[in-house]
């Protein structure tokens, strides 16, 4: 009993310390909105703040979101679990995102389901916080989540700022458990006899975060005992160096001038040449932000554009152009005759239909087995069956598909083996069902179709 009490007390102390270091409001009582899914992390956070609310003089409110992207029994079960737990403890709001809204948002944003669900979920957080006049919105990200995020960004070639990991505070969003590990969270829940729900999608290997969590991290622990400490030290050094670059950048004597009439950014050519590589990168990022909105731009584009010089006076890359014109540098959006990979499409199928893609016209046909996708030039029955709703889209970074041996193979590698022309690679139809790539329609470019159907295995 004494050990349980001490463990619980230590956990509460860590949560309180994390919260206090991020909270700058002195008005009382604080109104806190907790984002609770029913999983271990958010249930531990909720339980902790219910115990701490008198110490911090706070009113606790809970929001749980039903995304309607998992089976109804499972997703409604999670929501009802949270509602029941909060019943006599604190007010709880259930936000229902209508069915297919996440899929439609993924199509509109040209992203995956996870990103679309997060975008909609955070919109619900903001709306609920506004209606409750909440001071802060609390999410239950923990130390493990942060390491996973850092490693994913590291291997994706992210910038130094992104390698700082999950931000502890962004606006009124606070993450008080970033210094608490998942094992500490589960130990606290077990010792306090607090129930939680398991999300089956946390085990699905199709999601990059799950691959990192279940495959990469165990190997790191075997090969590099205590790797977390080493990573922390490296990140601290990167942060110090990046802070120096940012401080140096703020002393620059010129800025981009946005020319709205010409839809371009301008600066002095000699000033651009005078910047060293790190500052030139920051300067280009600033210019492209003025031009692009929020679209992610690969580092290779910046690397190309930085090469502007007296001998190389015009450069096209990634849908942008930088050129020397007189004594100025002009930066603007431009599509050239160069081949571009900036193609994305996504069509969600939930009923028989005909639809157009950059790869041509397709039909979604239904029979007793399910849905089949057939290209206009295909004389066969096409590819399938698939269970709706499913998506026909262009490829995304990290796409993988099952092989006949049961292992996974990257779609990029398959495309390379098929020798698909560069301009056709990003219009090759990919079929995604339940967040998993289940088919590649290779026949549109004279290749064999590749698809996975239930227990029947891989068909090529």
Curated annotation (Swiss-Prot):
Cited InterPro entries: Lysidine-tRNA-synth_C (IPR012796), Rossmann-like_a/b/a_fold (IPR014729), TilS/TtcA_N (IPR011063), tRNA_Ile_lys_synt (IPR012094), tRNA_Ile_lys_synt_N (IPR012795)
Record Gene3D superfamilies: HUPs
GO cellular component labels: cytoplasm
Name of the top EC class for this enzyme: ligase
UniProt subcellular location: Cytoplasm
Catalyzed reactions per annotation: cytidine(34) in tRNA(Ile2) + L-lysine + ATP = lysidine(34) in tRNA(Ile2) + AMP + diphosphate + H(+)
Family note: Belongs to the tRNA(Ile)-lysidine synthase family.
Free-text domain note: The N-terminal region contains the highly conserved SGGXDS motif, predicted to be a P-loop motif involved in ATP binding.
Protein's recorded name: tRNA(Ile)-lysidine synthase
Organism the protein comes from: Treponema denticola (strain ATCC 35405 / DSM 14222 / CIP 103919 / JCM 8153 / KCTC 15104)
């Amino acid at each position: 009993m004494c050990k349980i009490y001490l463990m619980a007390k230590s956990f509460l102390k860590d949560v309180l310390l994390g919260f206090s270091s991020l909270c700058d409001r002195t008005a009382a009582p604080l109104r806190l909105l907790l984002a609770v899914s029913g999983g271990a992390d958010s249930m531990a956070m909720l339980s902790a703040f219910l115990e701490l609310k008198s110490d911090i003089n706070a009113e606790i409110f809970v929001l749980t979101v039903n995304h309607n992207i998992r089976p109804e029994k499972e997703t409604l079960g999670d929501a009802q679990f949270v509602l029941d737990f909060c019943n006599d403890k604190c007010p709880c709001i259930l936000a229902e995102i209508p069915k297919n809204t996440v899929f439609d948002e993924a199509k509109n944003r040209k992203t995956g389901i996870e990103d679309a669900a997060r975008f909609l979920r955070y919109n619900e957080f903001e709306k609920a916080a506004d209606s409750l006049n909440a001071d802060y919105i609390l999410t239950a990200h923990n130390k493990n989540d942060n390491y996973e995020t850092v490693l994913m960004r590291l291997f994706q070639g992210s910038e130094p700022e992104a390698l700082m990991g999950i931000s502890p505070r962004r606006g009124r969003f606070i993450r008080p458990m970033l210094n608490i590990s998942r094992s500490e969270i589960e130990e606290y829940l077990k010792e306090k006899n607090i129930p939680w729900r398991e999300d089956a999608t946390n085990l699905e290997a199709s999601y990059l975060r799950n691959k990192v969590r279940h495959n990469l991290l165990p190997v790191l622990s075997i090969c590099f005992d205590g790797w977390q400490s080493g990573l922390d030290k490296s990140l601290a050094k990167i942060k110090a160096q990046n802070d120096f670059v940012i401080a140096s950048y703020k002393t620059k004597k010129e800025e981009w001038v946005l020319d709205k009439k010409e839809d371009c950014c301008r600066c002095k050519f000699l000033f651009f040449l005078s910047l060293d590589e790190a500052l030139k990168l920051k300067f280009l990022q600033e210019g492209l932000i003025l031009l692009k909105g929020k679209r992610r731009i690969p580092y290779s584009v910046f690397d190309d554009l930085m090469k502007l010089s007296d001998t190389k006076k015009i450069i096209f890359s990634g849908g942008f152009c930088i050129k020397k014109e007189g004594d100025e540098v002009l930066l603007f959006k431009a599509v050239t005759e160069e081949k571009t990979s900036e193609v994305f499409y996504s069509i969600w199928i939930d009923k028989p239909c005909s639809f157009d893609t950059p790869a041509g016209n397709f039909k979604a046909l239904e029979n007793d087995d399910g849905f089949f996708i057939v290209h206009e030039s295909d004389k066969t029955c096409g590819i399938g069956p698939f269970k709706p709703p499913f998506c026909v889209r262009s490829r995304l970074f990290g796409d993988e598909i099952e092989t006949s041996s049961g292992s996974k193979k990257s779609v990029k590698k398959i495309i390379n083996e098929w020798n698909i022309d560069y301009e056709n690679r990003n219009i090759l139809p990919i079929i995604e069902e339940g967040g998993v790539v289940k088919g590649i329609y290779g026949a549109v470019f004279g290749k064999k179709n590749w698809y996975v159907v239930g227990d029947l295995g891989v068909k090529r």
